[in-house]
């Protein structure tokens, strides 16, 4: 019986036919509509023409690799959530994927249930907003314009990605309160489970560098063993 509910559309990209078939089958059984691509160029065409709700993308592919695909999508202002898959587990590799604009990074091998949970988290995050505030929040020389999605330090605009601003907005709305990694994963990335990822630390690092680039004071502080807080020292 047709319930009128449309299943989320996921584009899965991998040049390994066995992996691709396995992911397609698993995601379909989990309730997703699935399209596939076997290389980066095909993935970029499909993402542009068919507008999937999320992309699961292997990082090592012929023609156009995963990082290049994400970079191209973001350059076209396509903010589709992307989960990058890779056998590379080093921090540098994860950072490269995230800096390109990926929303999540999952190391192979992984359990299908975790991939499904992460895709659902990305979709939840996309369907909501990082914050409901309608004000400009000030912390020392930092101004966070929530409705305008702009940040300024000493009156100078700070160039932030969508995810960086989402994280900063959440921290600003809870200024002086220490938020744990788990809380930030849920509020910013939409995770409702204990994800094994250092994505919060990576993005905190991005924000610190950008906020302090002009010689501004340290505003983002780490509370060892607890989490992170936005405040003047």
Swiss-Prot record:
Keyword Transmembrane helix carried by entry: no
GO cellular component: cytosol; plasma membrane; protein-DNA complex
Residue ranges: DNA binding: 134-232
Keyword terms: Cytoplasm, DNA-binding, Magnesium, Metal-binding, Phosphoprotein, Transcription, Transcription regulation, Two-component regulatory system
Molecular functions (GO terms): calcium ion binding; magnesium ion binding; phosphorelay response regulator activity; transcription cis-regulatory region binding
Entries under CDD domains matching the protein: REC_OmpR_PrrA-like, trans_reg_C
Binding, Mg(2+): 15, 58, 60
Name under which the protein is recorded: Transcriptional regulatory protein PrrA
Species in which this protein is naturally found: Mycobacterium tuberculosis (strain ATCC 25618 / H37Rv)
């Amino acid at each position: 019986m047709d319930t009128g509910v449309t299943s989320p559309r996921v584009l899965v990209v991998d040049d390994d036919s066995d992996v691709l078939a396995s992911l397609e089958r698993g995601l379909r059984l989990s309730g997703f509509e699935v399209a596939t691509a076997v290389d980066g160029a095909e993935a970029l065409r499909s993402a542009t023409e068919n507008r999937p709700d999320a992309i699961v993308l292997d990082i090592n592919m012929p023609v156009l690799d995963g990082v290049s695909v994400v970079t191209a999508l973001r350059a076209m202002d396509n903010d589709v959530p992307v989960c990058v898959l890779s056998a590379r587990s080093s921090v540098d590799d994860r950072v490269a994927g995230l800096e390109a604009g990926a929303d999540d990074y999952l190391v192979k091998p992984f359990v299908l249930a975790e991939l499904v949970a992460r895709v659902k988290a990305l979709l939840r995050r996309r369907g909501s907003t990082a914050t409901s505030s309608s004000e400009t929040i000030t912390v020392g020389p930092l101004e966070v314009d929530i409705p305008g999605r702009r940040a300024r330090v000493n009156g100078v605009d700070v160039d932030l990605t969508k995810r960086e601003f989402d994280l900063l907005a959440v921290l600003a709305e809870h200024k002086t309160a220490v938020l744990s990694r788990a809380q930030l994963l849920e509020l910013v990335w939409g995770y409702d489970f204990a994800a094994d990822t250092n994505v919060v630390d990576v993005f905190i690092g991005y924000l610190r560098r950008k906020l302090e680039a002009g010689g501004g004071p340290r505003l983002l502080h780490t509370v060892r063993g607890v989490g992170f807080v936005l405040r003047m020292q």
